[in-house]
């Protein structure tokens, strides 16, 4: 304590205060300078010289950044060793991180940003792969390469892989790679990918008879809720899909929903900017969307399986950007920001592992705010006694049983995954 705080106190009183706070003050987190020095190791200045104006470019990660990717793969494998999923449904999605850094490039929405592309494992609630990118890099740029890297990071115990992606994944090489079984490890990869609604797509949808459109209710428990949406399969065959009679089958599923307020005359083009619409013969205006798949499920089941990804990608990116501070980029250096994002991915998977393996199923869906409230921000005392670490809480604290149960599960994890 400072002299001003102990002024006019007796020596015995000052001695009591010193003994009360005799532990020296130490940093609980690294200093900003140490953090910046650490993050600078992930930046490769030579890659910046390879950039070309107005062209999409992804810097090659250096050894340090690749090392974080290997650590993440090891963590995914550790969690998989305990939960044992045989199937991996991979959801690929990109997100925009708005920033005001001068080094950042403009995204398609017109502001400076970075745009990471993330591969999320739905069954395991883990991020398998996430590539940090500039804001001007399209979401579908080199998506096949990212998919192959994600497949390489999956644990050996995974036997089957399926893919879901928005319209950014509607790429010939990506779809053919999955449908033709080009992957040496997993073979044919079942997928459902959003389709860009082109004039040809609208033309095929307009040719369908009304009897071909099937209702698409929403399933709520054991009940079906009417949505007004309908689905139908199209006979659309793009040129690149029809080169061989022995090629894989691609199914195009269209979903339409009537517009509650049809566009005014001459305003149709403005409506196209927000959502694809089309006018059905003698039926009025509809919102129209499309999905391409190689799965053999019924069309309505394909739509529901595809829509299961909706919202989850935004939630995952929301946790990364807000809960784990991945969206608070610390530097103007691309590599430093990429390292910061990779650390946020590690924190996401660590948080998911703790919830699944230590806290229990009822905690899997809870955000980090709930975990902080119940487990982290607790008033207590940490005591070292007889070479043991003790945590003392208030008597009857509601989090006490949860902490004890989590501690026992963590100790059990030290003995390795259960033997099959």
What residue ranges belong to the model's regions?
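Short acidic, glycine/serine/threonine-rich loops at helix termini
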Residues: 100-105, 128-132, 172-180, 202-208
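An anionic, glycine-rich sequence signature occurring as long contiguous blocks
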Residues: 187-322, 408-420
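Electropositive, glycine- and tryptophan-enriched low-complexity nucleic-acid-binding patches
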Residues: 107-157
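Short amphipathic alpha-helical "interface-anchor" segments enriched in bulky aromatics
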Residues: 302-339, 343-354
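Domain-level cores of phosphate- or acyl-group-handling catalytic modules
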Residues: 138-200
């Amino acid at each position: 304590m400072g002299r001003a705080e102990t002024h006019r106190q007796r020596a015995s009183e000052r001695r009591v205060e010193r003994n009360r706070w005799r532990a020296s003050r130490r940093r609980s987190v690294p200093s900003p300078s140490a953090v910046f020095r650490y993050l600078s190791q992930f930046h490769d200045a030579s890659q910046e010289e390879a950039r070309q104006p107005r062209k999409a470019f992804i810097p090659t990660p250096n050894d340090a950044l690749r090392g974080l990717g290997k650590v993440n793969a090891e963590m995914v494998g550790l969690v998989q060793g305990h939960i044992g999923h045989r199937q991996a449904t991979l959801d690929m999605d990109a997100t925009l991180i708005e920033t005001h850094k001068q080094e950042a490039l403009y995204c398609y929405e017109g502001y400076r940003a970075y745009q990471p592309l993330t591969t999320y494992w739905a069954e395991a609630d883990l991020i398998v792969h996430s590539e940090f990118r500039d804001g001007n890099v399209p979401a579908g740029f080199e998506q096949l390469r990212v998919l192959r890297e994600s497949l390489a990071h999956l644990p050996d115990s995974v036997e089957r892989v399926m893919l879901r992606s928005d319209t950014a994944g509607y790429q010939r090489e990506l779809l053919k790679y999955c449908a033709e079984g080009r992957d040496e490890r997993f073979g044919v990869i079942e997928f459902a990918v959003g389709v860009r609604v082109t004039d040809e797509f609208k033309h095929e949808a307009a040719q369908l008879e009304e009897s071909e459109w099937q209702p698409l209710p929403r399933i709520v428990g054991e009940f079906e809720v009417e949505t007004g949406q309908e689905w139908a399969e199209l006979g659309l065959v793009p040129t690149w899909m029809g080169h061989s009679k022995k090629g894989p089958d691609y199914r195009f599923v269209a979903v339409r929903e009537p517009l509650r307020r049809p566009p005014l005359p001459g305003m149709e083009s403005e409506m196209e900017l927000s959502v694809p619409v089309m006018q059905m013969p003698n039926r009025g205006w509809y919102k129209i969307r499309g999905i391409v798949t190689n799965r053999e499920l019924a069309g309505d089941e394909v739509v529901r399986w595809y829509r299961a990804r909706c919202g989850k990608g935004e939630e995952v990116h929301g946790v990364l950007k807000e809960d784990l501070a991945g969206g608070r980029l610390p530097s103007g250096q691309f590599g430093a920001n990429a390292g910061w994002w990779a650390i946020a991915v590690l924190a996401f998977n660590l948080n998911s592992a703790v919830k699944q393996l230590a806290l229990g199923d009822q905690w899997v869906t809870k955000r980090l705010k709930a975990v902080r409230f119940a487990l982290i921000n607790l008033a207590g005392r940490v005591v070292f006694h007889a070479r043991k670490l003790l945590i003392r809480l208030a008597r009857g604290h509601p989090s006490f049983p949860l902490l004890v149960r989590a501690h026992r599960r963590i100790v059990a994890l030290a003995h390795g995954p259960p033997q099959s």
